[in-house]
């Protein structure tokens, strides 16, 4: 083999080695890029997991707060309902006592005889004196007695008033 052929073969071998080196470099670059993409994907997945966990915790906390507020409102409503029930029970008890009193009064009135009418009584009213007339049982035997003032000697100044006893 002559030098030319050896040179050519060496050149071809060098070109093949260069091509292999380029291919190897490209493969290594692709591998590095793939590793980078995998690392980025892993990091993104981790970030997504952290965000999902944060979101889940936030949703859970919000739900717990809403449940607590709702429970508080329910308890307040139950207390109001209980208070209203107590008021209704007290009113029902009072109504029952009133009905019993009305029934007792009605029965009492139905058992009580009607009162007889009372005759009108004439009463003299004087501002500072009261006059009392004492009449004997048989007024025909004696003369009419003079009124005797019981307080002071004042004359009658007020008009007579009539009262009916009930």
UniProtKB/Swiss-Prot annotation:
<comment type="subunit">
    <text>Heterodimer of P6 and P9; further multimerizes as hexamers of heterodimers. Part of the dodecameric portal complex that is composed of the packaging efficiency factor P6, the DNA packaging ATPase P9, and the internal heterododecamer P20/P22 which spans the virion inner membrane.</text>
</comment>
<dbReference type="GO" id="GO:0019073">
    <property type="term" value="P:viral DNA genome packaging"/>
</dbReference>
<comment type="function">
    <text>Together with the packaging ATPase P9, forms the external part of the portal vertex that is embeded in the capsid and which plays critical roles in genome packaging and genome ejection. Both proteins multimerize as a single ring-shaped heterdodecamer arranged around a central channel.</text>
</comment>
<protein>
    <recommendedName>
        <fullName>Packaging efficiency factor P6</fullName>
    </recommendedName>
</protein>
<dbReference type="GO" id="GO:0044423">
    <property type="term" value="C:virion component"/>
</dbReference>
<keyword id="KW-0946">Virion</keyword>
<keyword id="KW-1188">Viral release from host cell</keyword>
<feature type="region of interest" description="Disordered">
    <location>
        <begin position="134"/>
        <end position="166"/>
    </location>
</feature>
<keyword id="KW-0231">Viral genome packaging</keyword>
């Amino acid at each position: 083999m002559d030098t030319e052929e050896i040179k050519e073969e060496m050149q071809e071998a060098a070109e093949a080695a260069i091509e292999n080196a380029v291919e190897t470099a490209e493969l290594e670059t692709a591998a590095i890029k793939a590793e980078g993409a995998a690392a980025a994907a892993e990091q993104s997945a981790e970030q997504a997991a952290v965000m999902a966990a944060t979101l889940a915790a936030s949703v859970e906390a919000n739900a717990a707060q809403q449940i607590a507020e709702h429970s508080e409102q329910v308890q307040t409503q139950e207390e109001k309902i209980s208070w209203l029930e107590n008021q209704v029970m007290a009113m029902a008890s009072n109504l029952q006592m009133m009905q019993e009193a009305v029934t007792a009064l009605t029965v009492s009135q139905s058992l009580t005889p009607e009162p007889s009418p009372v005759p009108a009584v004439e009463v003299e009213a004087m501002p500072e004196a009261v006059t009392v007339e004492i009449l004997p049982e048989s007024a025909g035997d004696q003369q009419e007695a003079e009124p005797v003032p019981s307080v002071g000697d004042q004359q009658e100044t007020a008009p007579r008033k009539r009262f009916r006893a009930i």
